[in-house]
Structures are given as structure tokens and as C-alpha cells.
Amino acid sequence: MLVSSSVLKDDSSLRIFKESPNEFEYIIKRHDMDDRKEDTESKERRSTMGSSFIRFGRGQSFFNNLDNSAFDNEIDSKVSRHPRWKSPDIVIRFGRSGMKSTNDEQPKRGKNDLNFIRFGRNIQIVPTDFDLSAVCSALMSNDAISDAGLHPDVTRLFRLCNNLNKITGEISLDSLETNSNHRE
């Protein structure tokens, strides 16, 4: 839907940009704000590149409403106060990238990456690079098959592999079913 440096337009005056170097960052800009110059201090107010949160608000303290002059010195005079219909650009970052690479190796997953992404309760989505035939062959070559008291999830996985075997003929689990019938 969004390609690097592409613009997604709607009926309002907003533009949504996809930043190419970071896959988790989008920038929303207003049409008439493109020529606005930004100083470095306003950029520092935004969350830094590695952050995983979104800052909301307009940078104004609640002390602005007080008449006490002692608080006037604490309020930053460089805060730009745009009207709501001409607010500055909004940068939204969706978490951090968990892919790490060392030297010339393949990218590695970070310790916080999930193998399954859960949407709702007990609904799992398997990653796209999941190779079930490799899992089934690894389970068959494992010595844990002969052990009594397999976990119910493992037996379900064996049944799935057996059903795939009937379709493809590549994996043989008939001996497992024979062994499981003798245990019962």
C-alpha cells in the first residue's frame, strides 16, 4: 500500500510519507507546511530514532495559564504554537526493528521478536518462512517419539504431519500411530 517515498492522499490536507531507511516510521505532513523550516531544537523535542513510543501534546506547559512570573522563566520560549489546523509534522514510529546483523552475516532476530503474532485470544499466525516439512522430519528423527506421555500439542503436530504425508507422500508417520495405539 505504501511504497518508499510514496504519498497517500485523501480529501483532507494531510500527506503520509513512508520513510525509506526505517520500515517502522511514517510522517504525516500538511500541504501548506512543506516550506516551513525546522530548527534543531524542535527536532530534538521529537522522540529519538530508537524510541518505541509516540509523544502527543503541543509542548505547552499547564503553567502558561498561571499569572505567576516565576514560572515564565521555566517555559521554553522557542516552542512553536501553531493553530490546530496548522500543526507541525507528526512522526509516528511503530516499535523497533528486531533484525540485527553482524558484519556480513545474515540478519538475526532480536531476543524480543515473536515467532507467533497473536491477534485476539488463542489465534496464532505462523510466520511466512515457516517450513513445516522440516519440522515434521525433525520430529520424526527425534528420539522423543518413543517416550511415553507426549504433550498433546506434539501429538496434534504428529497428526498434522501424518495428514500432510497422505497428501504429499514425503513424510511417514504410520509407525507413530501404531506405537500410540499400543500405549492406549
From Swiss-Prot:
Keywords: Amidation, Cleavage on pair of basic residues, Neuropeptide, Secreted
Highest taxon of source: Eukaryota
Annotated compartments: Secreted
Keyword Secreted: yes
Main location as per UniProt: secreted
Pro-piece positions: 1-44, 59-83, 97-107, 122-184
CC per GO annotation: extracellular region
Expression by tissue: Expressed throughout the central nervous system.
Family: Belongs to the FARP (FMRFamide related peptide) family.
Name by which UniProt lists this protein: FMRFamide-related peptides
Organism (species): Camponotus floridanus
